[in-house]
Amino acid sequence: LLVASDRDNRTNLFGLELHSGQIQQLTDLNPLPLPREVEFLRACVSDTRDEAYFWYGMELRALDLHRLETRVLYRMEDGWDVSMINCSADGRHVYASVSEDMSSRFRVDYLRGYVGFRETWAARPLSRILRIAVDGSGGQTLFEESYWIGHVNTSPTRNELLTFCHEGPWNEVDNRIWGMNVETGAVWKIRARQEEGEAVGHEYWHADGERI
């Protein structure tokens, strides 16, 4: 089991061996200046490779869970805010959502009180869904729009399917959950709002990769 822990005023990734209870530190990262910071809410683990993936600043890194060595898969250019990542079912790609960095326009601190959350939603930042190869050969933009995108979730069984969300106040976004076929580029509403003020969120895939 992988967990994040704050120790000695630093945030790092740790492995917990469930049978013995032994904890091992897996990363040794220096703190980053705000508005960037080290946090593993956005990390993911491959089902096919002994690797975990996480953002460190603007770098998407791969961590070998045995050798504890890291490598940089991709670097996002400045002016963007990186968000959730998820691995494809076959382990060949990491998918990520990114959006325009709004911190120069108003105060942003989502992790401490959702500061700037509503303002970011109202600003409708340009957002993208990226596909990044785990072999280090680079990444590409699959989809973009002027609406705050977050929570890219890949099907655990079907390489071509993922969901993403329109981020913002759940009861006010135009539609929370969207599906995407990364092979055809088709995008559709997974579940349209059924009544005014309805709030939908925190969607996850079932293990069959067909239902959320």
Question: What residue spans do the PLM features occupy?
Answer:
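Blade-loop segments of beta-propeller domains
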Residues: 8-54
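Beta-propeller domains
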Residues: 141-212
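Surface loop/turn motifs at the tips and blade-to-blade linkers of beta-strand repeat domains
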Residues: 27-38, 74-78, 142-147, 190-196
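Short loop/turn segments that connect beta-strands within beta-propeller blades
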Residues: 17-21, 65-68, 133-137, 181-185
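Beta-rich catalytic cores
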Residues: 9, 39, 81-83, 125, ...
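Blade-terminus and WD-like Trp-Asp/Gly-His loop motifs, strongest in beta-propeller folds
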Residues: 1-2, 42-50, 55, 85-93, ...
